[in-house]
């Protein structure tokens, strides 16, 4: 790449990935629509950090995580900085909170959480440190599989003004927020389609703010699991953090035409609030935007949603601590040696980063997780008395997903064809088990 990388414009280039000296991916030189890749700084506040995050857009779809199936191929990827500043963590940083949060989402039964792996990054022959190579929120067979013509993916975004007109506002949305497009039929340039999505969102919001029967408008399964995830992470960030919503098919049946919550994302400020209070995602209140809300403050005024939240929490509560401990044990086994070696190299350019070992970080995360889940138990008991209202069914048909220890979904690969190792199988009721392939 011959030009400086900025957060305004893409820079074209070539991307090569190697593993133990072998080339596992080569985009070749950039030819628009044919080969190569484009690269730019991504993020809002994180774009000002020393280890800047990057957005990658390939000319040709590929699976940069090398899972072997064409359904994983995409043009859209990201490199997230290894250093995650968080004053609640040892030495003021966490390098594992993103993987931890994504694993929590999978164990809660969220339909898709981005897969990722750690990589060492070199740009124009200059070492730039450890990064997390991760799937981004986009339409895809193994991402958010929305209909090409009648589905959409949007983000409730405080930085809507930076999207070159690719956004809309709804009637109940705060004036400083906007919905930006992650996937919009016609790439957001067809005003008829955008108006259809806006009208759909206004109908959903009217139902929520009017305290109507919810199950005809929103998917209680994803809405409850998304907020439980943030409650268990004690998220200390609200506005400006990523809140994704999607509809698989606005013209579809009663399962696929409801509004759904997307994956857990932007987890930097986890465990950065007192454990005795609800997280900011739960309340959507911050002092300098006292009127700021997403849907959850209104939803928790509706007995039907309160009961749905409690029902979901009761389903996941018996297993979730063991599931997250299994994840931490697996990450320690997988990454301890290789990441410690890379961390030493990382510190040659960022001497104050990567100070904590993998076992130290997983132990700290599990300590926080156990204390937080006990606090949420108490908050539910104090704030959510029984309403006597039926939540309606919020279960999914029984199915299983299988993940390797990096979070890659390997469900489509026959178990007999998988490499030897440890895998996590998650059923749609939230239960998981660890299996060994010898």
Question: What are these language model-derived features?
Answer:
Residues 10-22, 119-121, 400-402, 423:
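Short polybasic amphipathic segments
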Residues 6-9, 30-32, 46-50, 70-73, ...:
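Extracellular/periplasmic catalytic domains that process cell-envelope and extracellular macromolecules
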Residues 2-5, 43-45, 49, 90, ...:
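Middle-to-C-terminal accessory/interaction subdomains
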Residues 57-63, 71-86, 109-114, 126-228, ...:
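Internal "kinase-insert"/substrate-recognition segments embedded within catalytic cores
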Residues 388-438:
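C-terminal outer-membrane/trafficking sorting elements
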Residues 1-96, 100:
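Conserved NTP-binding catalytic cores of kinases and kinase-like/nucleotidyltransferase enzymes
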Residues 53-57, 75-81, 95, 103, ...:
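Structural recognition of the beta-strand scaffold that forms the well-ordered cores
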Residues 90-124, 408:
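A conserved helix-loop-beta module that forms one wall/lid of the active-site cleft
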């Amino acid at each position: 790449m011959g030009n400086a990388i900025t957060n305004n414009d893409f820079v074209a280039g070539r991307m090569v990935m190697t593993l133990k000296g072998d080339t596992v991916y080569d985009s070749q030189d950039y030819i628009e629509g044919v080969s190569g890749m484009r690269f730019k700084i991504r993020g809002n506040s994180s774009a000002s950090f020393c280890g800047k995050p990057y957005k990658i857009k390939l000319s040709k779809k590929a699976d940069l995580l090398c899972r072997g199936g064409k359904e994983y191929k995409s043009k859209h990827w990201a490199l997230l900085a290894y250093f995650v500043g968080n004053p609640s963590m040892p030495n003021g940083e966490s390098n594992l909170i993103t993987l931890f949060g994504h694993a929590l989402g999978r164990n809660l039964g969220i339909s898709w959480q981005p897969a990722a792996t750690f990589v060492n990054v070199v740009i124009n022959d200059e070492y730039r440190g450890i990064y997390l190579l991760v799937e981004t929120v986009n339409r895809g067979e193994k991402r958010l599989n929305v209909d090409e013509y009648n589905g959409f993916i949007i983000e409730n975004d405080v930085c809507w003004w930076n999207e070159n007109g690719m956004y809309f506002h709804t009637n109940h949305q705060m004036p400083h927020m906007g919905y930006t497009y992650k996937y919009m039929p016609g790439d957001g340039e067809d005003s008829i389609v955008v108006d259809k999505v806006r009208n759909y969102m206004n109908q959903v919001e009217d139902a929520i703010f009017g305290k109507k029967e919810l199950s005809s408008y929103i998917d209680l399964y994803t809405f409850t699991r998304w907020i439980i995830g943030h409650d268990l992470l004690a998220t200390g960030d609200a506005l400006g953090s990523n809140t994704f919503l999607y509809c698989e098919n606005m013209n579809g049946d009663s399962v696929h035409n409801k509004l759904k919550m997307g994956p857990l994302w932007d987890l930097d400020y986890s465990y950065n609030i007192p454990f005795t209070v609800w997280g900011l995602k739960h309340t959507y209140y911050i002092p300098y935007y006292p009127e700021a809300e997403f849907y959850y403050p209104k939803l928790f005024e509706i007995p039907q949603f309160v009961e749905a939240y409690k029902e979901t929490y009761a389903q996941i509560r018996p297993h979730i601590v063991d599931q997250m401990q299994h994840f931490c044990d697996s990450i320690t086994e997988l990454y301890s040696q290789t990441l410690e070696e890379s961390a030493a190299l990382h510190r040659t350019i960022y001497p104050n980063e990567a100070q904590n070992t993998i076992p130290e970080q997983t132990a700290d995360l599990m300590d926080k997780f156990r204390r937080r889940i006990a606090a949420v138990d108490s908050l539910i008991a104090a704030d959510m008395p029984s309403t006597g209202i039926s939540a309606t069914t919020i279960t999914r048909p029984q199915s299983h997903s299988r993940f390797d220890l990096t979070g890659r979904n390997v469900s489509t690969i026959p178990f007999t064809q998988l490499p030897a190792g440890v895998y996590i199988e998650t059923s749609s009721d939230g239960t998981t088990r660890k299996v060994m392939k010898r």
